[in-house]
Every structure is written in structure tokens, then in C-alpha cells.
Amino acid sequence: MQKRKITKAQTVAIVAVFAALNVITDSFGGLPSSGIWSSWNFLMEPLTGIILGPLLGFAATVMGVMIGHYIYFRDAYEFLFTMGAPIGAAVSALLFRGKWKPVLGYYTILFAAYFLTPVAWQLPFWGMWDTYIAFAILLVVIFLIKKGLWKHESTRLPIVLAVIAFVGLEADVLFRIFVFIPCQTYRLFYGLNVEDLQYIWGSGAIITPIKVALSSIATVTIGHPLLETLRKAGLLIHH
């Protein structure tokens, strides 16, 4: 049977819905406020990319977090850091579609930038343990893609969604770390010293992975039935 082609109007409507959901989740403060994210938008980030694709997912997330940041204003600098959210959505979208090369390049470049920054040598290595696990998982996913084993059948879809949410959110984390450490905004924006950073690295190593786990659960719980419904209705965006 020939697949039904989604119309432009339907695409615009779906993008608008996800942009609105990103606005809503970004307009409320998260608990606790420490860690990478200060709102609940991390729950929507991977799912937006998975459903909409890398470009539309990026666009919907940008619109959502920018409006959300105006509604729930943190500070002017957060408008820069929150660009990690659309990047995370795009990474989730790329990996879901088996496009691993941009994701591998992104992780490699941002890790290199961090570890080549002198102040990073004074921070606890274990403080970014979740990003290391994400990178290791990414390498496993790449192996599976190359072997033709990266399948999205209904029985495997929950695992695929959980993995993609994890890798996508950690890509967001890496962007914010890149802005904070290699770009020196910890000093230029906030006037922090090494002792301050060491405390932040210690607390973030606990809180951030908990939020990533919550998002992975939400992505599987919502994403699995939603993807099946969109596929049956012929409304799944493939690009």
C-alpha cells in the first residue's frame, strides 16, 4: 500500500503543537533548580526532534524556549545557554533516523574543546560521568546502525526511544558546558572561580542525570504510542 504523504498544512499544524508544548514546559520552573535545566522543557526536547525531524524539531524547540524564556525570565544569558535545547532535539532526530555522523562529530568536537581548556583540568573528571556514558552508548548505536540492527519495530521502539532521549539530552548538556567552560562564560558572565565550578560540577553530577532519566521515561511513555498513532494516520514526518 502506498504511504500517505503528509500535507504542508498538517506539517505546520504538528510543528505548531510541539512549539506550543515547548513554550508551556519552558514557562515553569523545575524542581530542584540546580543542574543543567531550570524548567521542565527537558521532558519535551527529545520527543520534539524524534517526531518532527532535525530541522523542524530544531525550529519548534527554538520557538518554544525563546518564548518560554520571556514568560519565565531567568536572566539574559540563559537565552544563549538554552540553544542547547534545539541542538538536543536535532541530535535526537538525527539518531532516530540513523544519521550518526553529525552526532559523532558533534560529541567529539565538544569533548575536545572541553578537555583542551585548562580550567577543566581542575574540575572533577567524574562530574561529567553521564556524558561519557552517552558517548559510549552512541558508539554502540553506530555499530548497530552499520550492521543494520538499528530497527524501530514496535517491540524494540521503547529501548530505541530511551537511548535516543539520553544521547540527545546529553548533547544539550555538552553544548551548555561548551558555552560555560571553553567559552569562559563562567568568568565573563558570572564571575565564578575554580572553587565555585568544583561545587557546581559536584551537584550537577547528581541532579542532571536524574532529569535525563525522567525525560527518557517520558519519551518512552508518550513517544511509543504517539509514533504508532502518527504512523497509522500517515502523519509521521520523515525528513
Q: PLM features: residue spans?
A:
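Loop-helix junctions at membrane interfaces
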Residues: 1-239
